[in-house]
């Protein structure tokens, strides 16, 4: 068996086309474009690249982007004050603070300072809580993007054994809530999990989000499983790889996402979707 590759780039382009139509309709109706503010603290090269890509993608779908590049020695009070200004700026519908932040920041404090209706990353405790209560509003971008990948690929997960490797607040935990909402039976594996291989081996749907290159051996994968690899790990030789041994897993799985080109494009597409939803809601549409 050779797995079918799930093309995240192609599915993301389909979403971009829909966003473009809706954002231009928004402009015609309200006289302005939906607006996304991206805040970067420091000069981390990878973060700068991500921010630039987000700006370019915003421009391609008719979303206005506002960038603030703050120096690395910005203190928490200064960043909180800037977020406060964005919270009341009527041109801004969504706010994203690029992570990771420098070590002198408490990320949770910063995330909680963002107005819940502008939390387009979907990280605010209010939005995570709504998802837990089966009434999601603005959803965490990577988990929601994965759900779209599955839906667009015609993969039904209701009743399936789903295993998530990684329990972060950004991916693992909200991913578990998304899968529960969709009717899967969910196991979350973490650093204290015993016999990871056994858990992976029973997964009909595997979501790997540990941030450790090659953590999951292809030999562990259940025959016919769906493998979603969230990991984006840069190796010393410059190559980018996921958390799963792709070559081995591809011979056992039915479906698999490549790295890069699988989950990553969907995360950005969902961010833009959230920005549009937030904009429409702020102008009275019954999305959230």
Curated annotation (Swiss-Prot):
Pathway: One-carbon metabolism; tetrahydrofolate interconversion. It comes from the Bacteria. The keyword Amino-acid biosynthesis applies. PROSITE patterns: THF_DHG_CYH_2. GO terms for molecular function: methenyltetrahydrofolate cyclohydrolase activity; methylenetetrahydrofolate dehydrogenase (NADP+) activity. Keywords: Amino-acid biosynthesis, Histidine biosynthesis, Hydrolase, Methionine biosynthesis, Multifunctional enzyme, NADP, One-carbon metabolism, Oxidoreductase, Purine biosynthesis. Pfam families: THF_DHG_CYH, THF_DHG_CYH_C. One of its GO terms (cellular component) is cytosol. It catalyses: (6R)-5,10-methylene-5,6,7,8-tetrahydrofolate + NADP(+) = (6R)-5,10-methenyltetrahydrofolate + NADPH; (6R)-5,10-methenyltetrahydrofolate + H2O = (6R)-10-formyltetrahydrofolate + H(+). NADP(+) binds at residues 166-168, 232. Catalyzes the oxidation of 5,10-methylenetetrahydrofolate to 5,10-methenyltetrahydrofolate and then the hydrolysis of 5,10-methenyltetrahydrofolate to 10-formyltetrahydrofolate. Belongs to the tetrahydrofolate dehydrogenase/cyclohydrolase family. This is Bifunctional protein FolD.
